[in-house]
Amino acid sequence: MSHSSAPERATGAVITDWRPEDPAFWQQRGQRIASRNLWISVPCLLLAFCVWMLFSAVAVNLPKVGFNFTTDQLFMLTALPSVSGALLRVPYSFMVPIFGGRRWTAFSTGILIIPCVWLGFAVQDTSTPYSVFIIISLLCGFAGANFASSMANISFFFPKQKQGGALGLNGGLGNMGVSVMQLVAPLVVSLSIFAVFGSQGVKQPDGTELYLANASWIWVPFLAIFTIAAWFGMNDLATSKASIKEQLPVLKRGHLWIMSLLYLATFGSFIGFSAGFAMLSKTQFPDVQILQYAFFGPFIGALARSAGGALSDRLGGTRVTLVNFILMAIFSGLLFLTLPTDGQGGSFMAFFAVFLALFLTAGLGSGSTFQMISVIFRKLTMDRVKAEGGSDERAMREAATDTAAALGFISAIGAIGGFFIPKAFGSSLALTGSPVGAMKVFLIFYIACVVITWAVYGRHSKK
């Protein structure tokens, strides 16, 4: 029988009977199974974000270990993982319904060991060409793609009224990997903890040694552990199975492209600022030891993402998103007042404080826009199936599939911000010697998002 205990075991068995919208089923079985899958998914996604943003901590240190790359080249290394991550999120978003959440989570976590090991060896050899670092940075992008499949997978496990909180937790705590990496990397690069594997330090002017390989090697054992945990502890849902053909129609929805734009402004800002903040700070305030502070912004943004999902469940995603974009525009304007002019003036503490506010709102908006996506696409699909005379069971199944596909595809668009923001900073600095040009573009974009959110979802919320 489908209600046997076999599918419930934490052995990765396929669950054939899954009805999270049924209150009795949810209380008796569903909540326990969903929670277990969520809390294994979270550390897997957290580690993926650590790997995805590795170059945000490594690039700023490459000159210290003997590499002579230009500032624009270093910005490019921080930006490229977001390019491959964004492109790969599209196919990754379709993988869970094809292969199952357990199998795909284990596979996608395990393969991240490859760029981590390779980068550790590359940074120890100053003859390593720039092209090799480009390849490794693109491979780190596989980690960024994990977000699409992870969020799609978790969306299948939870009922509609709990999806905002669940997706907020998974995404928010997963996003925490950026700050965890930026906190841990500066600590471990000062320690000879992998000498047995060939890790060699480089003498610094202050007499200390920099073991840059540790910044990537430190994640390898944890990736191995949670690959095993995903394989044996998570479940595949038979009800989530769907071919790519069944998932593609969601791309025809106009709301998909509107929400992609809004998510680009929120999550794209979060991941873009995470990738480029350390390098930008180093160019504007060269005397500041920025890696001592860099982790604070992503940490606050990740916490805010969890809050954004839960807050949207209570107040409505549109309302939270609209207010959030207004705040992002205000903080972007304030940032101009904190920068030095011709190398003179400026206040790092004011710059840092405003950027923390931007990280906060980018994280909050990431959670609120994701909640909007879940609500919008579930309702659109259920209304369509009901209008066609379909059953409630079919409506719920197709709604879950469409929502997961939309979440994955929109997350791919959002990840592009991780490329554009650091690349925009690098290009603006190369052309004008200042990041102001890039910041003006961001400000205009946030104002446009205020107008779009109000025009499409604010005035016509009932529609």
Swiss-Prot record:
<feature type="transmembrane region" description="Helical">
    <location>
        <begin position="131"/>
        <end position="151"/>
    </location>
</feature>
<feature type="transmembrane region" description="Helical">
    <location>
        <begin position="317"/>
        <end position="338"/>
    </location>
</feature>
<feature type="topological domain" description="Cytoplasmic">
    <location>
        <begin position="96"/>
        <end position="102"/>
    </location>
</feature>
<feature type="transmembrane region" description="Helical">
    <location>
        <begin position="38"/>
        <end position="59"/>
    </location>
</feature>
<dbReference type="GO" id="GO:0015113">
    <property type="term" value="F:nitrite transmembrane transporter activity"/>
</dbReference>
<keyword id="KW-0997">Cell inner membrane</keyword>
<feature type="topological domain" description="Periplasmic">
    <location>
        <begin position="282"/>
        <end position="289"/>
    </location>
</feature>
<feature type="topological domain" description="Periplasmic">
    <location>
        <begin position="190"/>
        <end position="211"/>
    </location>
</feature>
<feature type="topological domain" description="Cytoplasmic">
    <location>
        <begin position="313"/>
        <end position="316"/>
    </location>
</feature>
<feature type="transmembrane region" description="Helical">
    <location>
        <begin position="167"/>
        <end position="189"/>
    </location>
</feature>
<dbReference type="GO" id="GO:0043602">
    <property type="term" value="P:nitrate catabolic process"/>
</dbReference>
<dbReference type="GO" id="GO:0015707">
    <property type="term" value="P:nitrite transport"/>
</dbReference>
<feature type="topological domain" description="Cytoplasmic">
    <location>
        <begin position="234"/>
        <end position="253"/>
    </location>
</feature>
<dbReference type="Pfam" id="PF07690">
    <property type="entry name" value="MFS_1"/>
</dbReference>
<feature type="binding site">
    <location>
        <position position="263"/>
    </location>
    <ligand>
        <name>nitrate</name>
    </ligand>
</feature>
<dbReference type="InterPro" id="IPR036259">
    <property type="entry name" value="MFS_trans_sf"/>
</dbReference>
<dbReference type="InterPro" id="IPR011701">
    <property type="entry name" value="MFS"/>
</dbReference>
<feature type="topological domain" description="Cytoplasmic">
    <location>
        <begin position="1"/>
        <end position="37"/>
    </location>
</feature>
<feature type="transmembrane region" description="Helical">
    <location>
        <begin position="290"/>
        <end position="312"/>
    </location>
</feature>
<feature type="binding site">
    <location>
        <position position="89"/>
    </location>
    <ligand>
        <name>nitrite</name>
    </ligand>
</feature>
<feature type="topological domain" description="Periplasmic">
    <location>
        <begin position="428"/>
        <end position="435"/>
    </location>
</feature>
<keyword id="KW-0812">Transmembrane</keyword>
<keyword id="KW-0472">Membrane</keyword>
<feature type="transmembrane region" description="Helical">
    <location>
        <begin position="436"/>
        <end position="458"/>
    </location>
</feature>
<feature type="transmembrane region" description="Helical">
    <location>
        <begin position="406"/>
        <end position="427"/>
    </location>
</feature>
<feature type="topological domain" description="Cytoplasmic">
    <location>
        <begin position="459"/>
        <end position="463"/>
    </location>
</feature>
<keyword id="KW-0813">Transport</keyword>
<dbReference type="GO" id="GO:0005452">
    <property type="term" value="F:solute:inorganic anion antiporter activity"/>
</dbReference>
<dbReference type="GO" id="GO:0015706">
    <property type="term" value="P:nitrate transmembrane transport"/>
</dbReference>
<feature type="binding site">
    <location>
        <position position="175"/>
    </location>
    <ligand>
        <name>nitrate</name>
    </ligand>
</feature>
<feature type="binding site">
    <location>
        <position position="89"/>
    </location>
    <ligand>
        <name>nitrate</name>
    </ligand>
</feature>
<comment type="function">
    <text>Catalyzes nitrate uptake, nitrite uptake and nitrite export across the cytoplasmic membrane. Functions as a nitrate/nitrite exchanger, and protons are unlikely to be co-transported.</text>
</comment>
<dbReference type="InterPro" id="IPR004737">
    <property type="entry name" value="NO3_transporter_NarK/NarU-like"/>
</dbReference>
<feature type="site" description="Important for activity">
    <location>
        <position position="305"/>
    </location>
</feature>
<feature type="topological domain" description="Periplasmic">
    <location>
        <begin position="123"/>
        <end position="130"/>
    </location>
</feature>
<dbReference type="GO" id="GO:0005886">
    <property type="term" value="C:plasma membrane"/>
</dbReference>
<dbReference type="GO" id="GO:0042128">
    <property type="term" value="P:nitrate assimilation"/>
</dbReference>
<feature type="transmembrane region" description="Helical">
    <location>
        <begin position="348"/>
        <end position="373"/>
    </location>
</feature>
<feature type="transmembrane region" description="Helical">
    <location>
        <begin position="212"/>
        <end position="233"/>
    </location>
</feature>
<dbReference type="InterPro" id="IPR044772">
    <property type="entry name" value="NO3_transporter"/>
</dbReference>
<feature type="topological domain" description="Cytoplasmic">
    <location>
        <begin position="374"/>
        <end position="405"/>
    </location>
</feature>
<feature type="topological domain" description="Cytoplasmic">
    <location>
        <begin position="152"/>
        <end position="166"/>
    </location>
</feature>
